[in-house]
Amino acid sequence: MRQYNVTGMSCAACSARVEKAVGKVPGVTSCSVSLLTNSMGVEGDVPPEQIIAAVEQAGYGASEKGAGEKKPSGADATALEDKETPVLKRRLIASVGFLLVLMYFSMGHMMWGWPLPAWFEDNHIAMGLVQLLLAGIVMVINQKFFISGFKSLWHRSPNMDTLVAMGSMASFLWSVYVLFAMTRAQVDGNMEAVMDYMMDFYFESAAMILTLITVGKMLEARSKGKTTDALKGLMNMAPKTAVLVKGEKEVTVPIEQVEKGDIFVVRPGESIPVDGKILEGHSAVNEAALTGESIPVDKEEGDLVSAATINQSGFIRCEATRVGEDTTLSQIIRMVSDAAATKAPIAKIADKVSGVFVPVVILIAVVTTIVWLLAGQNVGYALARGISVLVISCPCALGLATPVAIMVGNGMGAKNGILFKTAVSLEEAGRVQIVALDKTGTITSGEPRVTDLVCEPGYDEKTLLELAGALEKKSEHPLAKAVLLEIAQRKIATKEVEDFQALAGNGLTGILEGHRLLGGSMKYISGQVTVGKQVKNQAQILAKQGKTPLLFAKDDVLIGMIAVADVIKEDSPKAVQELQNMGIRVVMLTGDNEQTAKAIGAQAGVDQVIAGVLPDGKEAVIRKLKEYGKVAMVGDGINDAPALTRADIGIAIGAGADVAIDAADVVLMKSRLSDVPAAVRLSRATLRNIHENLFWAFFYNIIGIPLAAGVWIPIFGWTLNPMFGALAMSLSSFCVVSNALRLNLFKVKDSHRDHKIKNEVTLPQWEASKGEKNMTKTMTIKGMMCGHCEARVKKTLEELEHVSEAQVSHEKGTAVVCMETEVADEVLKKAVEDQGYQVENIQ
């Protein structure tokens, strides 16, 4: 999508006109115009020159945003600066100054008996001329209304400025006519007519309309400026300089000059300038700027750091990995600003109304004037009713109702580490009825941890870990990392084993100080040493809880068992409970067997567990779930991308794969499941705010226009002076924007006001097919020449833990592996390659 800056827009009718004009350009597939940010997003294979020409032909200005330019993360902050308010403030001060003098002459003497210079006594012509001059000056000060309004009218796309310009100009021209008529009457000596004409002056209305609308515009501009505070805050976080290492020297350079691969240093208290990898040193880094999490994260050599985060302690030397618009901060800024440039589906209602609103209002004003003339009223009275209709009508309130709430909602999300990529995702997240959670990395941490230690008599936990660690230290198995992490946390020293062997599909063996050590699965160890019934029962209990028991022996005698599992995150049960309290059904998807899956599901408290789902089968499950309601998919892996795309709302955990993040509609920077209900909560609050804004905008116009037209005069005697109509118009947009700003006070983590949705869904019990109960992987193997090779590979694979069957063909060079639960590709590959064959691919 190409982004453009658009100038000259003043209300929703303007944005609708630009959108319509660009949408007609051949090759444009979609166009979205944001009145709030004066920007436009265009999709389609069309040269920028054609787009700009279409906008200019519609009576506005456009320029392409600098795509692909190398610039710092905060370079666009100036584009969001409130340049409108200072200009409007100067116009308002000047307008009020002349308006007060005008009001003194037009109403002060007549209504309150305020003194006038002697030469004005009974000099009605002079009074009229002074009012004409003062009103003219106010009109010149506010000439932008007339230039924009009549220019839009000329291009057959009238806007709010057209209504204001027509109302003010009509008042002024009528008053000029009355002044000439009064002059004629005074020449004729008809003083009674002169006094009547004095009452028909509307010079003060012409000036007052412009001044009051300027008041409203200034308040609106100031409030609109506040809606982008979150985005401007993100942009201003970007450091302006970096300290690069050039040979033996340290050189401070502008951030724009930092290249990928440069070496930079960061001292305590300084901001990290670009994304990088720590080469030397360690520190605690405050990542609140990106994640909203105030607790510093410990970083050491090899860890990644992000731009705009704060180095709180320690000197670090880093290599730049992402610079300019590729940094994490820049991507966040781009997501938030792109979301503001898109339109929510609910905005289409206001857009359709705004597109025809101004022409209809002009027609109503003309009809109102004619009807009152036909009813026998004089021209001045009828004109006042028509002018009131023009100046009270406000398309701006309609046009701003949705985008201001979307902008504030997006800003609140960004502050809390929740990034909505589009306005559609912000709106739709609150309507979700089913949330499907990937198990690994979403509900669980994604990294195995030691959960249980069971020691045989004569051995304690420390000794068990010392002996187990000696073996696992040389193993490449994923579960070995969990054991070594536990040893590191307990600060237990381990010794080196000799004659170490990793027996593929079986276990580990080695010699430590003359003693033979064994380690591995129940299947392997029970074939080597005697395993008591009590230990076997304990192993079964642990397996039912979703844990993997690892047994260890010394000199053919069992010494203990270590249970390892991918433990659930601390906040997962609470997050699931909060979603359920909102009336949302929570489903867990996993490739594990049913027993393991149900154990994890019970700990998390999900409504339903769907086990044995292949990586490429998640998309099919989401498609099936969508038959029952609106579905959100939460995942973090590459194999989650199809499911994230298929779901109504795809939510990616921020620590996951880039592919998953690209496929998602919402990105959770903190990688915490509790941010899923927070995202739903924020979406609902934003949607509620939009409904309030739209109600006010429609209600205001439905009540205001009939009142201005004089519909209630025959019944209640209610009438509306054009000046009060202008005041009402100026405040309407301000009220809408102010209401949207209330979202800044919303607490996304507060679950006390959560309520269930009206249309809760009921899910049937999921029956996994035979194909879903057993995971399969297809291995492409090079080097198998005969049936003996087949048998060898088949035996090796079937001896692996959780492998139920292996179908091997030396003709095809493949092995189809059926598993009770997922076995890591590395384990399968190592088992086969240890037998002398080459694994080319695993799918």
Model regions and ranges:
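Membrane-embedded alpha-helical bundles of multi-pass transporters
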Residues: M111-I125, W154, L173, M412, ...
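Conserved cytosolic catalytic loops of P-type ATPases
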Residues: P26-D45, E49, F201, K232-D326, ...
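Juxtamembrane coupling segments of multi-pass membrane pumps/enzymes
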Residues: M182, Q186, M191-A193, A207-P268, ...
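Conserved ATP-binding TGD loop and adjacent catalytic N/P-domain core of P-type ATPases
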Residues: A16, T29, V432, L512-G514, ...
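Conserved catalytic phosphorylation-site environment of P-type ATPases
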Residues: L290, I349, A384, A397-L471, ...
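Flexible metal-binding regulatory segments at protein termini and peripheral loops
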Residues: M1-A126, K224, K249-T252, R334-T342, ...
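Transmembrane helix-loop-helix hairpins at the membrane interface
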Residues: V87-T241, K352, L453, G717-P722, ...
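P-type ATPase nucleotide-binding
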Residues: V450, V454-M582, E594, V606-I622
